[in-house]
Design a protein with these regions (language model features):
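Active-site-facing substrate-recognition patch
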Residues: 1-58, 195-196
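PRPP-dependent phosphoribosyltransferase catalytic core
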Residues: 1-7, 132-196
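Short glycine-rich phosphate-binding loop at a beta-alpha junction
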Residues: 61-72
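Conserved acidic residues
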Residues: 66, 113, 143
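Short, glycine/charge-rich flexible loops or terminal/linker lids adjacent to PRPP-binding catalytic cores
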Residues: 73, 78-116, 126-129, 181
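Active-site-proximal mixed secondary-structure blocks
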Residues: 123
């Protein structure tokens, strides 16, 4: 079975350069998981072990999941694939015209529903936290977080729920003023979808 890293490389989802991340940090590496998730067979494979662990935790009573949600854009296909493997429904949150994460398109969350949030990449967890805020304000309980790539650094905010990454990959993250690539005069590109 191919590993998550092999799938990321095979799909050309691991990019090298100077990137401005959605978190506002700079990095020499970017994970464009859409390149992997566009292939249904690869999406299935990258989440197989994640879903296996989730199912084990559900079976032992450590986790309860009623619905799967992902923050747009990166979490839409990821959440759908995990939900498919769990035989659950998948919905997504997205930013409204004011840039506020919200539940739209007629999607509903019911009080006391147990929600698994799924993302493509977790760097700071900001999108996951924004998604969780929307859901908990509607009375849902966040039961866990899953992702393709966990690229958090040691100083990142800790994840407060059970966490199921397909792979943990260390990548350099810098604040803009400390960015080694900026100091070298290399222009940054912003491939993500969130407006900073």
């Amino acid at each position: 079975m191919e590993t998550a890293v092999e799938l990321l490389k095979k799909s050309s989802a691991m990019l090298e350069g100077h990137f401005l991340l959605s978190s506002g940090k700079h990095s020499n590496q970017y994970f464009q998981c859409a390149r992997l998730l566009q292939h249904p067979q690869m999406a299935e494979k990258v989440f197989e072990n994640v879903v296996k662990k989730i199912k084990e935790d559900i079976k032992t009573g450590k986790l309860k999941v009623d619905i799967v949600t992902g923050p747009a854009m990166g979490g839409i296909i990821a959440a759908w694939e995990v939900a498919r493997q769990l035989s659950l429904s998948a919905i997504f949150t997205e930013r409204d015209e004011n840039g506020i994460m919200s539940l739209r398109r007629g999607f509903e969350i019911h009080e006391r529903q147990n929600v698994l949030i799924v993302e493509d990449v977790v760097t700071t967890g900001k999108s996951s936290m924004e998604c969780a805020k929307v859901l908990t304000e509607k009375g849902a309980a966040i039961s866990g977080l899953a992702c393709v790539v966990d690229r958090r650094t040691d100083d990142a905010q800790s994840i407060q729920w059970p966490f199921y990454p397909a792979v943990k990959l260390a990548a350099n993250n810098w604040d803009a003023q400390a960015c080694e690539l900026c100091k070298q005069g290399i222009p940054a590109v912003k491939p993500g979808s969130r407006k900073i």
